[in-house]
Swiss-Prot record:
The keyword tRNA-binding does not apply. The gene is ATP4. Inhibited by cipargamin and other spiroindolone compounds. Inhibited by 4-cyano-3-methylisoquinoline derivatives MB14 and MB10 but not RK18. Inhibited by (+)-SJ733, a dihydroisoquinolone compound. Keywords: ATP-binding, Cell membrane, Hydrolase, Ion transport, Membrane, Nucleotide-binding, Sodium, Sodium transport, Translocase, Transmembrane, Transmembrane helix, Transport. The keyword Cell membrane applies. It comes from Plasmodium falciparum (isolate 3D7). This is P-type sodium-transporting ATPase4.
Length: 1264
């Protein structure tokens, strides 16, 4: 609704109480003076105080006041209610008397009192003085232009600074999780672990690139506002007409505007010639606004004698004084609000939760790093796989590995991929997400504030009923003899095929038959008498067709046409007149049904210059036509003794307004013709019947328009031509010697709810998401729509029940006055906590409602389409702009755009948002559970003096490659059955709740650690014969050699190792002993696998149980500087010295040589690595639901693919040369792979039978 409705007052009951919206467009002298006197009203909430120049002791001329009050019709002084002022003492203000002459009334109060727009009410003469404008005919001089520019500023809206791409990219590295990963990467590179460091940096950089792209693609709302400004403007300067850039326009400039111009600044008009502007960008009102010199309504910020920056001139021309520029204009104030709401970070609940999680992970990483390194130093931990490396270096590498294991490297990437995939899902549901985190934010939305027209409804008004009004009618409604209700049918959007039938006769069966007749292109009369068929001759048809003809002629500038490509019917022109044009076509008034229609219409000459256009103050439109036949309009006879009616005024508008101005009725004569009942005027009883009928229709959610006629003589027309002002013509038509209006009937239209809206609202109710409807409609219509879509229960019939759920937005203001300040927060919050329907709403009311709801702790989604909706969209947690009817500014201020403008899309998006968060919980639980499990089994391995189950690079591989795919698959999980049957999560709820920690993460970490450690111990045992470091270290023999430079320094070298291995092959199953020794024949260190069957301690190379080939190699003993030890193995002699390097030293296992214990340990650890991978891979299956995993096993085929990829990558990492050396893995035998997987299956079994069973019993309802 237009902001011109700002004068709406108080609450409105459903009974016949006249809206205070009925304030007439003029203001009485008494009210204006009283408003100036009233100190309590010396504020202006509609326009900024800063926009009003304070001017005490201002003189107001009585004749100016009287000019304004001349337009007040009799009985229309309801502005007194608006001001709530007594009319006493008008001639004695501040002790100064006012006579009937043009004397001056001195008023000490500032004229900028609340309820009156200063720039609309102030005289042009005083505005000129205020701005230094000497003459409106010459404009400003150059010196005054400079003064005004310095004083009021330049005329531009400053765009937000464009954030460069590189800065957006760098900002992606500021999250705690990403910073931790960067620290781990730097540490890895510093320790020469290049592969690990590069891998981490690559993953983080890829994630930053994705996030940068999404953020950069979002629009700039303030920039869009600035782009709307006209590039140039025509002004008067120094007596000359010049064209200047709009930015150079200053306050006080005289601006000339013409058809097609975009207005550069806010103007006060002083000269207009049929000037109309379109202000829909600001007000949301699609109607062109006819501009006047004298304002229709002084209380609205969008008075008709003002023009506004960024609006366009649709017809006519005019001149005006610039009253505001730049950020002081109406559109500038919107830009200021946008800037204000943009200040500071607007983190979504997910971003907050991820930051908290990152902080927790960082704390864990630091603690783990310090504790593990300290513990490893204390116990002098030495990894057998790196026995030849510096122990301190190994310990630091281990610490970094632990820190890496505590950080879920894949988390940022998976979150980004999840949100991106969710955004794509929403596009499929007609929701375009502009800001990626908003995808998930919808999941915790607890309130949806929705527009009605086009969002909850289809936005396609369709005429449903025609009601004729006629005395002595041969066919009338059952409950009265004055009206008769007819139904248009079928009613399918703008399709003009259909007829007009008696409502009492149009049963469900008849409707089906009519549809069949329509499809077969046969006459409806064969089914039911069509009162809209021109071929049917009856007095009732005369009445219905005359009613629709009058309505059609009044809507002359709206046309109906069919797209030749899509074959869809559409309306061109005023959409609010569309239903009338379509309905008229159904009774034969269209080019479609009547080829000669144009020539027929040409018989009715329209008098364009006399038209009274519709605005929100008049609530009516009047067109004037010359009659084809005097005293006859269509089938209505206007004869009156002594009068010759040559013209007719056709009036269409609000029923209450038109009924107030009606004096006579039509009647049906005994001769079965329709004529005006001039002999009697409308009685109160007859008025009550018409009022009741209007109310009956409006309570069915129908928009009711009254159609009236007023016959005029040639003399009337001549007198009307002398009146330049439309309101004067309205007054004349209403109160001339011919009487007032003659009502012909009502046309009731219905904007049907969108399919699925009622079900969507019920879904929201089940999901405990509050739905609020905000509309410009009157309260009864809004309530009726609310009932129709299920927003209010049908049983809510009592006024007190409805008032507890629906209010007019004026009630949000002090004294129920929309021009006074908003109620205090505590009182306001009481309203917004329970109200579901806000009627008579203005765009500025939306931001008030949003702010109140946010104070109450709700997470608010707000829909909007206009420029003036942008601040509310920005203030809401989730701004939702309309894709079809939305302005670019609204889209730029929003997080999401509804491609189809459909409310159901918002609900679908909430469903997707909840699913996304649920899936984020699942993969965060999955990643944290596996990572903490890694910390536990790595820590226990150190304490238990066992080799590490995994190395640092294996951990990174596990976290990124094998965990990454299942985590992404978890993000594609379908919603749970109760997804939209649970309340929205609180905004401050962490990602991982206590339940997730106690039943999801901690049990799994314990079970995974247990299974991996069991796998490590068992694997080491079957590969080396021992499971701990001491046992493995004792398998090797060493020699201590004196340093060549210092006799007190010794260097320790291994010269022999043995280990045990359990084999399963076709020819042997059992233990074997493997040895590493110095081969004297080849003069090198070698490994001999299967040196002897069984576990042989202190093995001798010449023993009979030793493999013959080994005996052959050692049969000649050692030579040179080597000697045999007690078991017959070569070693350096005791007198041998060393410089600490063993590259040239014989008889030892040189640096870099991988002996049987190292190889056995690697094999055992590879098996543990396989177990860890499969533990985490199978965990992805168990974390999907609290139900047993087999029940949801096949609901997400992506999971099977992801786990197949992870399993394949893991297998390849143990078999492909090069990769195995990087990851320090080795290829296993088939049964060793199976044994490793067995421990993972044990982990799955424990996850299923312990925590999930307990959780289901405690929290889940058992379904019968």
């Amino acid at each position: 609704m237009s902001s011109q409705n700002n004068n709406k007052q108080g609450g409105q009951d459903i009974n016949n109480k006249k809206d205070s919206d009925d304030i007439k467009p003029s203001v009485s002298k008494e009210d204006l003076i009283n408003s100036l006197k009233n100190d309590e009203l010396n504020k202006n909430t509609t326009m900024d105080q800063n926009d009003m120049k304070k001017n005490e002791n201002m003189n107001i001329k009585k004749n100016e006041v009287l000019n304004n009050s001349n337009n007040v019709e009799d009985g229309d002084n309801e502005n007194s209610k608006f001001m709530n002022k007594s009319k006493e003492g008008l001639n004695n203000i501040n002790g100064e008397k006012n006579d009937d002459n043009n004397s001056i009334v001195k008023v000490e109060e500032s004229p900028k009192s609340i309820g009156y727009n200063y720039y609309a009410s102030e005289s042009i003469e005083n505005l000129c003085k205020e701005f230094g404008l000497e003459s409106i005919n010459t404009g400003l001089n150059s010196e005054q232009v400079k003064i005004n520019r310095d004083k009021y500023g330049e005329n531009f809206i400053e765009k937000d600074e464009v954030v460069p791409v590189w800065l957006i990219f760098l900002s992606q590295y500021c999250s705690p999780v990403v910073l931790l990963l960067l620290v781990a990467a730097v540490a890895s590179l510093a320790l020469n672990e290049v592969v690990e460091g590069v891998a981490i940096i690559s993953i983080v950089t890829l994630n930053a690139c994705l996030a940068t792209y999404m953020e950069k693609s979002s629009g700039d709302a303030i920039g869009k506002l600035a782009e709307m400004a006209s590039p140039q403007c025509t002004v008067l300067r120094n007596g000359q007409k010049v064209v200047i850039p709009s930015r150079e326009v200053v306050v006080g400039d005289v601006v000339l505007i013409n058809t097609g111009d975009s207005i550069s600044a806010d103007l006060r008009l002083f000269d207009v010639i049929e000037l109309k502007t379109n202000e829909s960008l600001l007000t949301g009102e699609s109607e062109d606004i006819k501009k006047t010199i004298v304002a229709d309504n002084l209380s609205t910020p969008f008075a008709t004698n003002l023009c506004f920056a960024t609006t366009s001139v649709t017809s006519g021309s005019g001149k005006g004084i610039v009253i505001s520029t730049g950020l002081d204009t109406q559109v500038g104030k919107i830009a200021s609000q946008l800037k204000k709401s943009s200040k500071g970070s607007k983190l979504t609940p997910l971003q907050v939760a991820l930051n908290k999680l990152g902080g927790l992970i960082g704390l864990i990483a630091i603690i783990v790093l310090v504790v593990i390194i300290s513990l490893a130093v204390i116990i002098k931990y030495r990894d057998p796989a790196h026995a030849d490396k510096d122990p301190t270096f190994v310990i630091i590498i281990i610490g970094v590995g632990f820190a890496v294991s505590s950080i879920p490297e894949g988390l940022p990437m998976v979150v980004t991929i999840t949100l991106s995939a969710g955004a794509k899902d929403m596009v499929k549901k007609n929701a375009n997400v502009r800001k990626l985190p908003a995808v998930e934010t919808l999941g915790c939305c607890s309130v949806i504030c929705s527009d009605k027209t086009g969002t909850l409804t289809e936005g396609k008004m369709t005429a449903i009923n025609a009601v004729t009004i006629c005395k002595n009618s041969s066919l009338s409604d059952e409950n009265n003899k004055l009206t008769k209700t007819f139904d248009f049918y079928p009613t399918k959007g703008f399709e003009p095929c259909g007829g007009l039938f008696d409502s009492n006769e149009l049963t469900s069966e008849k409707k089906k038959e009519i549809v069949i007749a329509k499809n077969q292109n046969t006459s409806y009369d064969k089914v039911l008498y069509n009162y809209g068929n021109p071929s049917n001759k009856s007095v009732i048809v005369d009445k219905t067709r005359s009613l629709m003809f009058a309505a059609y002629l009044n809507s002359y500038d709206t046309t109906l046409s069919r797209d030749p490509k899509t074959l869809k019917w559409g309306i061109h022109g005023n959409m609010s007149e569309g239903p009338i044009v379509v309905a008229a076509a159904k009774v034969g008034y269209s080019f479609i049904n009547n080829p000669n229609h144009k020539s027929y219409l040409d018989n009715f000459q329209r008098l364009d210059d006399l038209e009274v256009t519709f605005n929100s103050s008049r609530k009516m439109k009047i067109t004037f036509y010359k009659l084809k036949t005097v005293n006859v309009f269509e089938n209505v006879y206007l004869d009156k003794p002594g009068k010759v009616y040559t013209h007719v005024a056709l009036i269409k508008g609000a029923p209450d307004r038109l009924l107030d101005r009606s004096t006579h009725l039509l009647e049906e004569t005994s001769m079965k013709k329709v004529q005006v009942s001039w002999n009697s005027t409308i009685t109160q009883e007859e008025r009550n019947v018409l009022i009741k009928k209007n109310l009956e229709l409006s309570q069915k959610a129908l928009r009711v328009l009254s159609i009236c006629i007023k016959p005029l003589t040639d003399q009337n027309i001549e007198e009307l031509k002398k009146l330049e002002d439309a309101d004067e013509r309205l007054k004349y038509v209403n109160y001339d010697e011919n009487g007032g209006f003659i009502p012909m009937g009502y046309v009731a239209s219905f904007d049907p709810p969108r399919p699925g809206v009622k079900e969507a609202i019920q879904t929201c109710r089940e999901a405990q998401v509050k739905v609020i409807m905000i509309t410009g409609d009157q309260k009864p219509t809004a309530v009726a729509i609310g009932k129709l879509i299920g927003l209010i229960e049908e049983k809510s019939e009592q006024v007190e029940d409805i008032n507890s759920l629906a209010i007019e937005c004026s009630e949000l203001h002090i004294n129920k006055n929309p021009n006074e300040p908003i109620l205090p927060n505590d009182q306001l919050d009481e309203f917004t906590d329970k109200i579901l329907i806000y009627s008579r709403a203005q765009p500025e009311d939306k931001i008030t409602i949003v702010q109140s709801l946010k104070r109450k702790g709700y997470l608010v989604a707000m829909t909007g389409d206009g420029v003036n909706d942008a601040p509310a969209l920005k203030a809401a947690d989730i701004g939702v702009a309309m894709g079809i009817n939305g302005t670019e500014v609204a889209k730029g201020a929003s997080e999401m755009i509804l491609i189809d403008d459909n409310f159901c899309t918002v609900v679908s998006a909430i469903d997707v948002g909840r699913t996304i968060f649920s899936n984020i919980q699942k993969f965060v639980c999955f990643l944290l559970g596996t990572n903490i499990g890694e910390i536990i089994y790595l820590s226990v391995a150190i304490v238990a003096q066992m080799p590490f189950p995994l190395e640092a690079l294996q951990i990174l591989f596990l976290n990124l490659m094998t965990d990454g795919c299942p985590a992404v698959a978890l993000s594609r999980e379908p919603p749970n059955d109760d997804n939209m049957k649970t309340p929205p999560r609180p905004k401050k709820q962490p990602i991982m709740t206590k339940r997730w920690w106690f039943y999801g993460i901690l049990p799994h970490t314990i079970f995974e650690a247990l299974c991996v450690l069991l796998s490590l111990a068992f694997s080491l045992y079957i590969c080396t014969g021992f499971y701990n470091l001491n046992g493995i270290h004792n398998l090797c023999k060493t020699v201590n050699l004196v340093d060549v430079n210092d006799a007190n320094v010794y260097h320790e070298y291994k010269y022999f190792c043995s280990s045990y291995e359990y084999r399963i092959s076709t020819d042997y199953v059992g233990w074997v002993t493997n040895v590493s020794f110095w081969d004297p024949q080849n003069n090198e260190a070698v490994n001999f696998w299967g040196a002897a069957k069984g576990k042989v301690e202190n093995i001798n190379p010449l023993s009979d149980i030793v493999h013959p080939e080994l005996r052959l190699r050692m049969q000649d003993g050692c030579s040179g500087d080597l000697t045999l030890d007690e078991n017959g193995w070569c070693r350096p002699k005791d007198n041998k010295t060393s410089d600490g390097y063993n590259d040239e030293l014989e008889g030892i296992l040189k640096k870099g040589f991988e002996d049987v214990t190292a190889k056995g340990s690697k094999r055992g650890r590879t098996m543990a690595f396989i177990s860890a991978v499969w533990c985490e891979m199978l965990r992805a299956y168990t974390v999907r639901s609290w139900e047993p995993f087999y029940k949801v096993f096949n609901r997400n085929m992506w999971m099977h693919l992801a786990c197949s990829i992870s399993a394949t990558l893991t297998f390849l990492s143990t078999c492909i040369p090069g990769i195995t050396s990087i990851l320090n893995t080795t290829c296993l035998l088939w049964w060793q792979y199976l044994l490793a997987i067995f421990w993972a299956l044990l982990n799955l079994f424990l996850d299923e039978i312990v925590p999930k069973v307990i959780y289901r019993r405690k929290y889940m309802t058992i379904k019968n």
